[in-house]
């Protein structure tokens, strides 16, 4: 048996409902009833990277980073394919640039979505400390 199973249904049009475990996920290619697939992928990536960033903090001795927020940006090419992703990571803790770089490197190694993306789509990450 596989590790992940989903079922995706579209009754009409371009909106889909995916059953993921006990959760329904609404995705709509036209952005009418839910986010489009590209936006959902970027949000999923950020939602994976943020806890990986926290684990990276723990592994480097910073157990309490405080509030962490990722603002993600993405560009599309002329075919509406993802071309670039960037993360601005805002962290309550005030650490040095070197400490944030080490945490970011660990987060990139830990984040499963980061690993799943082709290299040119892996996010350019900027970290801002003492952000809140």
Curated annotation (Swiss-Prot):
Q: Does the record bear Ubl conjugation in its keywords?
A: yes
Gene3D superfamilies named among the record's database cross-references: 3.30.300.20
- A Pfam short name: OsmC
Identify the domain of life.
Archaea
Answer yes or no on keyword Repeat. Answer: no
Q: Which UniProt keywords apply?
A: Isopeptide bond, Ubl conjugation
- From the record heading this protein, give the residue positions of the covalent cross-link Glycyl lysine isopeptide (Lys-Gly) (interchain with G-Cter in SAMP2): 59
Family the UniProt entry places it in: Belongs to the OsmC/Ohr family.
Protein known as? Uncharacterized protein HVO_1289
Name its species.
Answer: Haloferax volcanii (strain ATCC 29605 / DSM 3757 / JCM 8879 / NBRC 14742 / NCIMB 2012 / VKM B-1768 / DS2) (Halobacterium volcanii)
């Amino acid at each position: 048996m596989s590790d992940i199973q989903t079922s995706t249904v579209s009754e009409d049009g371009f909106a889909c409902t995916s059953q993921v475990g006990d959760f329904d996920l609404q995705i709509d290619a036209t952005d009418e009833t839910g986010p489009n697939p590209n936006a959902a992928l970027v949000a999923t990536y950020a939602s994976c990277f943020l806890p990986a960033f926290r684990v990276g903090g723990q592994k480097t001795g910073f157990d309490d980073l405080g509030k962490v927020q990722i603002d993600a940006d993405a560009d599309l090419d002329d075919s509406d394919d993802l071309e670039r992703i960037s993360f601005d990571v805002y962290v309550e803790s005030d650490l040095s640039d070197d400490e944030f770089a080490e945490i970011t490197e660990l987060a990139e190694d830990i984040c499963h979505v980061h690993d799943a993306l082709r290299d040119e789509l892996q996010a350019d990450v900027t970290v801002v400390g003492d952000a809140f």
